[in-house]
Amino acid sequence: MSGIPLEANYLVIGGGAMGMAFTDMLMTGTESTVIMVDRHHQPGGHWNDAYPFVRLHQPSSFYGVNSKKLGSDTIDATGWNKGLYELATNGEVCAYFDQVMQQQFLPSGRVQYFPMCEYRGDQHFGSLVSDAEYDVVATKIVDATYMHVTVPSMRPPPYEVAEGATCVPLNALPRLAGQWDRYVVVGAGKTGMDACLFLLKNGVAPDQIGWVMPRHAWLFDRADIQGGQMFARTLGRWGGETFDAIAESESVDEFFANLSGRGLLLRLDESVQPTMWRCATVTQAELVQLRKINTIIRSGHVQRIEANSIVLDQGTAPTSPTTLHIDCTADGLEKRPATPVFAGRDITLQSLRMCQQVFSAAFIGHIESAYDGEALKNELCMPVPHPDTPLDYLRTVVGNLLNAARWAQDAELQAWLRHSRLDFLNAPDAGGEVDEELAQRLAVAAVAKLQRWLAEVDA
């Protein structure tokens, strides 16, 4: 059955942060028309499904779309983020993207937005709430869903929950907290940390909390990811000190020891070597709080939660019917294989810089708007896949440096980067000069050493 015919220059599949950031560049850099299709009722993607107390894990100042500021560049005066730039709440992020859609995209007359709709392939999509079906004629098809973002509320837990046991996604925590003798957080990533911090912040004693931690993670210090008046520290930590750590190391293990010694990477337990790295950020104050939790369950992944026992890969742990188990095991951003960003009519949005998906989507939008030729556009948009293990840290640093070296050869692109609010490594108002020649020499040496280490590991 044929659907209602539609036509536009671009069909953008997904109205999350990456789809919005890409489309924003088309709106500001071209006269193109766009059809945007999304399963949610409003823009923002997974932010619509996220737990109510979630905040950005990076400053608001370099999140969102390039054309509209998020937040007010306020430095938090209280709380565990004290002294650092503000982190937007879930509600603020959803409202922000809705404003971009309602106040910028739709009034332009160049965007048609179809919420509560599902793309079915072959330039066809349909409504999730009615019988409406649509056929699209579009010059380009943009996949803004390739990163497969998943949060706990989007699916049941990946383990069995027996009768007599209670397990909920952490979305339910504000509603259910206070009704239980104990809490067990399942999942060692940033979502699990947020659940623990929520409980601690609201007065739950550390000895009432258990934490299932199949893998320990390396963490970024959020103080090292700041713009504005703190940008000099950010640049020094991500540039000079990281180069120094590489230069002073003769092996992968020594490199991570040097990163840890400099505080460039943090960990929950100094006695445990992390086997996970997913870009999670934490403040020193948050780390102090998390370390108060002593019941850490390190017996692998949960297989089944019973009324009085948690069955794991390598053993069991006691629980009870009066314990609330909090599922924090969703993958978040998957580690996806790199694929060409530009392939004929298809554009696949991916990260081009370590853990900076929204900046990357805007960058791809700029390249699509300002450059011609598929080969050149792909040369400028080499994916840096989202990480999962510590070795991926090496791979992403190499990807970052190779991309930065290529971008540095293009004066017009450098000018765009300097004025992009989403590029936290090019704070436009920070001032200061960078010795580009020295930085290039250090980067070349760093890439050579990191690639040698990776080759040795893969051999």
Task: For the regions a language model picked out, list residue spans one by one.
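Dinucleotide-binding/catalytic capping subdomain of oxidoreductase cores
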Residues: L200-E306, Q350-A362
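Glycine-rich dinucleotide-binding loop and its adjacent helix/turn
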Residues: G83, T89, Y96, T145-G203, ...
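Glycine-rich active-site loop/strand segments that organize a redox cofactor
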Residues: R39-Y96, L170, V212-D269
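Glycine-enriched catalytic-core subsegment of oxygenase/oxidase enzymes
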Residues: L197, I296-S299, Q303-E436
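N-terminal Rossmann-like FAD-binding beta1-loop-alpha1 element of flavoenzymes
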Residues: P5-M36, Y183-N202
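Extreme N-terminal leader/targeting segments of oxidoreductases
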Residues: M1-Y10, T28-S32, M147-R175, A448, ...
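Short hydrophobic core segments
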Residues: L11-I13, Y134-V149, V184-V186, S320-D331
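Feature captures the FAD/FMN-dependent oxidoreductase FAD-binding
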Residues: A77-V151, D269-V272, C279, E286-L312, ...
